[in-house]
Amino acid sequence: MSLFNSSLNSKYDEISKLEMEEICSDIKNSPFDENKIAGLTKVLAKSGETLEFFNLDTADIPSTGGPSSLSTIISPLILKEYFAVPKLGIVGRPAGGIDVLAQIQGYNLKLSKKEIYEIIDKTQYCHFISNNHFAPLDSKLFKYRSENNFKNVPGLVIASLLSKKVAVDIKNVCLDVRYSHFGNFGNSLDEAIKLSDNFKLVSSLLGINSTFYFSDNTKLLQPYIGRGESLLAIHEYFLDIKNNWLNHHIEYDCREMVSTLTNHKIDLPELKSIIIKNFTENIECQGGSVGSFEKVVQKTKDSHIYEFSAKKSGILRIDMMKMRDTIVKIQSKYRDKGHEFPDPCGLIFLKNQKENISKNEAVLTFRVLENDLEYFKDELNKFIIID
């Protein structure tokens, strides 16, 4: 295998598909080897620019991906009370921290090293995208994995997750593990725990302290699904709109993730004011404004002109994989037309899984561009099931 030869350690854009196939096949077909995965992680991390924070204790809460969590936006706002948080993010499917914050006009995700250091020095937290500067080989290898049936290989998943942390000198990680049959970190809780043990072995070799928070990716963690909807959810939380479902996700899930690293929980009365303060500070430090945030929120809210109602009485089920894939497919259509982080559709659930629904009762509201309305309606009938 050419894992450590000169060609892999040269410029990331010079690596061939054959070399990537060798790497992926070797790791897929071999017993788990933490030393090999740690070695690959270092190569990926050092394929571009790197950050160093000699005098700061750094931390991050990355996730394994899933359609309904707000953790990559909310958790850093709490975490920065204890650590410096240089958050190198990736695009979500359908709504991750990077692409959600990108909806705010002026918010700068493509930061230089100098800008990152300045913002961290000033506020302890910034959120940015690789932009082919940080761990670019990881981005290239991820694209190859996605296209060639290597996406869910555990060793490759672990190397990819950790390479982005090593590149920006993260010393503490709580991995938000979302397990499901359509995820990349275990089909079940037992599988996810086993993979987390492997993750910890590798992270320890890299000098990173790691903890974990597990959730079932087949369940809706909160009801706002989409890029604009994620900002609307945050705004509703700020305004004290009573939504126990949303509040539990923010005040329990996101707060609990942070506490795995700090062994301390911020009191609930104080939590909201901290999140509001740090969210506002971050938006303004990275070039956005509260006014632009509120404008996106209002536009999203006003666009929810459609309603989906139950065609019969029964128990509500949601096919989370089909829901995710439907939204991502529509997003991809507009990304191909030159929009880097398009936001053409979204959902707000009024009912949760396993609730008893009456015929004609509203299950959710949604927004979608007119060109995609009929397709979206058809797909809704496939991923919303009443038994």
Residue ranges and their predicted role:
Residues 3, 7-14, 152, 170-387:
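Well-ordered secondary-structure scaffolds
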Residues 72, 96-100, 131, 138-142, ...:
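Short acidic, glycine/serine/threonine-rich loops at helix termini
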Residues 1-68, 104, 282:
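Acidic, glycine/proline-rich low-complexity segments that act as flexible tails and inter-domain linkers
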